[in-house]
């Protein structure tokens, strides 16, 4: 039977998005590039097969799943494996199959702790186990429009209005400047250069989208922590005061702009 893991808190043991993908790819010999690709459920099914041979029917897993109903079928296989091995964790299938970063990142953080608690180090050939199949890339969803908060952080009737200072770095969608040697005009030369630049732009856009999702994910957690601190601000708890100090700390020389002040000259894009 499996060793259950109930801790879901953020600790120093949690892996970053990049480290998590590296662990998955190395363990299962895959080439995942985004956390969102875990929404198919096939990765978890194979990890269960690695941890507890025979706990899941691996031939029922659709490693090339591209549609939501196929993802759901994979998670049903995973749920059956959890039940067989006595795993108490409830799988939020309806959220995971939507392919959103935050839901999938939270679940894989828990699963990594579960894996570490149960892995005995035995040899496992992941490619042979899945008969050479590779996980299909998840269709790229349109990037959501980031809604600006209607009220600044710290607004409320129970506590003074304060904001968590967030230093933002302007992200340019321009590709990095590269020295392009001038060549004599030849047939197709311009098309090749244009295609290469377009590819670079697309890669940068995907990187920006990933960074924005990750930023919003951790920003939401900081916001929740701030609300809890504000609700208990009247208490003389040294730990609470220390948390508040960390939340509102700024880098040396950083100044929070006054509301209503004319904006400074900004870089034009």
UniProtKB/Swiss-Prot annotation:
Q: Which GO terms describe its biological process?
A: attachment of mitotic spindle microtubules to kinetochore; cell division; establishment of mitotic spindle orientation; negative regulation of microtubule polymerization; protein localization to astral microtubule; protein localization to microtubule
Per the record, the major location class is cytoplasm
Gene Ontology molecular-function annotations: microtubule plus-end binding
Q: Where is this region: Disordered?
A: 168-190
Family classification: Belongs to the MAPRE family.
Q: What does this protein do?
A: Plus-end tracking protein (+TIP) that binds to the plus-end of microtubules and regulates the dynamics of the microtubule cytoskeleton. Promotes cytoplasmic microtubule nucleation and elongation. Involved in mitotic spindle positioning by stabilizing microtubules and promoting dynamic connection between astral microtubules and the cortex during mitotic chromosome segregation.
How is this protein named in the record? Answer: Microtubule-associated protein RP/EB family member 1
Which organism is this protein's natural source?
Xenopus tropicalis (Western clawed frog)
């Amino acid at each position: 039977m499996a060793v259950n893991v109930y801790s879901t808190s953020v600790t120093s043991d949690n892996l970053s998005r990049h480290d998590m993908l590296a662990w998955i790819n190395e363990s299962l010999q895959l080439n995942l590039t985004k956390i969102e690709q875990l929404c198919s459920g096939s990765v978890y099914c194979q990890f269960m097969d690695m941890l507890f041979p025979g706990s899941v029917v691996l031939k029922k897993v659709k490693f090339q799943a591209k549609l939501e109903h196929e993802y759901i079928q994979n998670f049903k296989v995973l749920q059956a494996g959890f039940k067989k091995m006595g795993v108490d964790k409830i799988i939020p299938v309806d959220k995971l199959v939507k392919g959103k970063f935050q839901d999938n990142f939270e679940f894989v953080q828990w699963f990594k702790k579960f894996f570490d608690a149960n892995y005995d180090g035995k040899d496992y050939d992941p490619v042979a186990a899945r008969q050479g199949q590779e996980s299909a890339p998840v269709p790229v969803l349109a990037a959501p429009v980031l809604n600006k908060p209607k009220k600044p952080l710290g607004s409320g009737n129970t506590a003074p209005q304060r904001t968590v200072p967030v230093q933002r770095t302007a992200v340019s969608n321009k590709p990095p400047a590269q020295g392009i040697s001038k060549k004599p005009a030849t047939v197709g030369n311009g098309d090749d250069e244009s295609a290469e630049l377009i590819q670079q732009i697309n890669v940068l856009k995907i990187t920006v989208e990933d960074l924005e999702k990750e930023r919003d994910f951790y920003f939401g957690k900081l916001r929740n922590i701030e609300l809890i601190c504000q609700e208990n601000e009247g208490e003389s708890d040294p730990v609470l005061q220390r948390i508040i100090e960390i939340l509102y700390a700024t880098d040396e020389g950083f100044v929070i702009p006054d509301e209503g002040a004319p904006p400074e000259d900004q870089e034009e894009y």
